[in-house]
Regions:
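Loop/turn elements at helix/coil->beta-strand transitions in domains of secreted/extracellular proteins
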Residues: 4-8, 26-30, 48-51, 94-99, ...
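Distinct, well-ordered alpha-helical segments
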Residues: 18-22, 44, 143-158, 179-189
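Boundary/entry segment of secreted carbohydrate-active catalytic domains
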Residues: 1-38
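Aromatic-rich peripheral "rim/lid" segments of glycoside hydrolase catalytic domains that contact
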Residues: 22, 48-52, 211-225, 230, ...
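Aromatic-lined carbohydrate-recognition surfaces of secreted/lumenal glycan-active proteins
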Residues: 129-148, 191-209, 244-255
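Aromatic- and acid-rich polysaccharide-binding/catalytic face
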Residues: 33-34, 50-64, 98, 148-183, ...
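Short, acidic/polar
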Residues: 12-24, 71-91, 146-153, 231-238
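Substrate-binding cleft of extracellular glycoside hydrolase catalytic domains
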Residues: 36-145, 158-161, 168-170, 214, ...
């Protein structure tokens, strides 16, 4: 029987020997990468990567001034050459490729602020589509955006090819609806005629969500438990996802420095084998009818 549920994948900060180990052992169906190596074209074929998501690190320039649309255009100009090189490298690969909008975990406290971020996402997606890319919008942090505010993001969902956000939890505390499995709650707030594109959880795993330890330093390896215990939690996490979730990428592979060392997936046979055992294709059983996508022009450059 064909396996159901979201694709299982990895989040890659940098392509290191550690990343190589995980790619070889896990052969993940899904990869999100911040590393723009043209070698991804080879890896997609060699490891049978079905969906490839790529994002430019732009946390140093996330301001929406002088306007959201102008901010999107500024970031597009900044990275246009890299976008073009990567697009050329990936042109003949069999994977579905998404460009994720560059704003990372931007907290929007009010519906008006979220609407401004939606406006920026809309403009970025327009530029991506014109250049021949599919695009994901969102890239929100765990617990964000607030469920009641989510309808303000409708304009971005209406143009996007997918929606992304991050979900973390603490050992034994998935807290579905609060820390994890939020896509169903978010989508339930939307008008009936609003597009509900496939959801990708583009960062996930055990972390210090509750803030009881120093931030950003307590991944799954920080807890004195066997790797198999993490696999049990990853399994429960994947199984709890609503049918609109197409895939999830576990944080993290490849790190320069030590900040994210406790999240590193390399050298964990149990975790790699769990990734390898996941479905190779996602079947949309959400019941959300996506309107026919407009023909996306292919860039001639």
């Amino acid at each position: 029987a064909k396996m159901s549920g979201p694709l299982r994948g990895i989040h890659v900060n940098a392509w290191t020997t550690a990343t190589d180990w995980t790619l070889r052992r896990a052969r993940p169906a899904l990869v999100k990468s911040l590393d723009w190596s043209p070698d991804w074209a080879r890896a997609i074929r060699e490891y049978d990567i079905r969906v490839f998501i790529i994002r430019k690190w732009a946390d140093d320039d996330s301001s929406l001034v002088p306007s959201p649309a102008a901010a999107a255009e500024r970031l597009w100009r900044r990275f246009a050459a890299d976008f073009g090189r990567m697009q050329a490298a990936l042109a003949d690969t069999p994977a579905t490729v998404y460009l994720e909008t560059p704003w990372n975990e931007v907290h929007q406290e009010t519906p008006d602020q979220l609407a401004r971020l939606a406006e920026a996402n809309v403009r970025f997606v327009e530029l991506a589509h014109t250049a021949g890319w599919k695009a994901l919008v969102g890239n929100f942090s765990v617990t964000w955006p607030l469920v009641d505010h989510f309808p303000a993001f409708v304009p971005a969902l209406a143009v996007a090819d997918g929606y992304s956000h991050h979900e973390y939890w603490m050992p034994g505390q998935l807290l579905p609806g609060e820390w994890t499995a939020r896509a169903g709650l978010l989508y339930a707030t939307l008008p009936a005629d609003c597009p509900r594109p496939p959801v990708y959880v583009t960062e996930c795993g055990i972390d210090n969500v509750a803030g009881t330890r120093p931030p950003n330093q307590y991944g799954w390896r920080s807890y004195p438990r066997p790797d198999a215990a993490y696999v049990v939690e990853l399994d429960a996490f994947a199984a709890s996802q609503p049918p609109s979730v197409a895939g999830l990428t576990v944080f993290n592979c490849g790190e320069v420095g030590t900040r994210w060392k406790s999240f590193e997936l390399a050298e964990s046979g149990p975790v790699a084998d769990w990734l390898a055992a996941g479905p190779r294709e996602w079947e949309d059983e959400s019941g959300h009818e996506m309107p026919p996508a407009e023909e996306v022009p292919v860039s001639k450059t």
